[in-house]
């Protein structure tokens, strides 16, 4: 399927949020937000706020809408800070890049985020019945897969997001499904250690995986949301704009064709040990996952839906970045919220061709 045949497109709207010049918590940018709705229907942004030294917190800001379009935000403070030991390293700390999925079956907002602690980036889970008070369920643990000979718990993991409704896993068990992106290179946390991908993995580049949590386990113990099993690859990098790695964006949404997943694709050179890369380019891609078997890709755009073309997307802490992380319906339209050059937050409209 070519990009012109792919049934969805993104149309750039503009910049939604910039760092406040005198706000120390935003000294190194606002970026990569989640979104959440309050009980009375108000829409909130949960931006990643980056202080000096690349220390990140998760903020809260109400989104202001004019004529059906998000145009501004009103800041309301911080909802999550790196306060746990596993969110802090000797020379680093952070809670980063949140994704939030409202799961009606649980009546909860489920947040995945990156805990940047002593072992590098690890995925963690938190839950909330509103937009302000988040209960940590802790870092994710991965059931060991002896067939692949891999313990995913050994590896850095980012870009995790829950599906909004249960699906049946490959064994037919009704489960909550999660997309995530493990990386096999351990040099950032163990210099000199070579990459050790799972046995038989045909492509070692960071790719999109899926894991599952049985619904009945969560009904017995909410903390099971952080215990994942049944891991398998969904998609590898394929096209020129994503030759280095790919990672999930907002929670997938149900469309006529299946599950629509927006994601980011990266091309360029990654320098080991560098948190804020300077020689890469991030773009927004899209694929359709099967409605019943979401580990199967039905179709995929062969070109990016949005690339770093404006000054706000090209110039920043990490240049040349479009990083979609949230998707919301406002009136008759859907809007995508994305990080711009690791410095600002932009908005694009999701259009049906």
What are these regions (language model features)?
Residues 1-28, 32, 36-93, 102-160, ...:
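Beta-rich carbohydrate-recognition and catalytic domains
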Residues 327-329:
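Electrostatic interaction modules used in gene-expression and signaling proteins
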